[in-house]
C-alpha cells in the first residue's frame, strides 16, 4: 500500500521518535511510505534546501498517489491539517493517531467522516497496533460507515 505519513515539522519535533517507529514498521511490512524522510532527524535540513512551492507541489502529488494517510497529530501543525483535509476530500482513508493526553484539535476529534479514524495510544506498541488495525480496515473500506477499531 502507498502511504502518506504526515507529522509536524515546523510545529515542533518533540514526537520524532514515534514518527520513526511508525515509519520503520510500515516499511518493514513492505508498504511504500512516500514521505518516510519526514520521520528522520535530518529532515529539517533537507526541507530547507527546497522552496515552499516545490514542497507544496511534491506533497500534493504524493497525496494524490497515496492509498491512505497516516498522521501523527500529537504536535499541532497547519500542514498536517491541510494534508488530512486534502485526503479526506478525495475519499481516501486517513488515520489520525496521537499520544494519550495530547490536546488535539476538535476539528479532528469531532470529525465523523466515514473515511477518518482517530485514535489515542499509550506507548509505541499500542501506536503500532492502532496503525495495523487501521491498515487492515482500510484494505476494504466499508462504504458509508464509520470505521471502528475496537
Question: Which residues are covered by each model-predicted region?
Answer:
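Conserved catalytic or regulatory cores that recognize and/or transform ribose-phosphate-containing ligands
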Residues: 1-150
Amino acid at each position: 500500500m502507498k502511504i502518506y505519513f504526515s507529522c509536524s515539522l515546523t510545529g515542533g519535533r518533540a514526537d520524532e521518535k514515534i514518527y520513526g517507529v511508525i515509519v520503520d514498521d510500515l516499511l518493514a511490512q513492505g508498504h511504500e511510505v512516500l514521505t518516510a524522510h519526514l520521520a528522520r532527524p535530518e529532515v529539517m535540513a533537507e526541507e530547507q534546501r527546497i522552496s515552499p512551492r516545490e514542497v507544496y507541489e511534491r506533497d500534493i502529488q504524493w497525496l494524490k498517489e497515496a492509498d491512505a494517510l497516516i498522521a501523527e497529530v500529537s504536535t499541532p501543525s497547519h500542514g498536517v491539517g491541510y494534508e488530512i483535509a486534502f485526503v479526506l476530500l478525495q475519499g481516501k482513508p486517513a488515520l489520525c493517531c496521537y499520544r494519550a493526553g495530547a490536546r488535539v484539535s476538535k476539528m479532528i476529534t469531532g470529525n465523523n467522516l466515514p473515511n477518518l479514524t482517530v485514535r489515542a495510544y499509550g506507548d509505541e506498541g499500542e501506536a503500532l497496533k492502532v496503525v495495523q488495525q487501521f491498515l487492515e480496515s482500510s484494505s476494504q473500506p466499508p462504504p458509508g460507515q464509520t470505521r471502528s477499531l475496537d
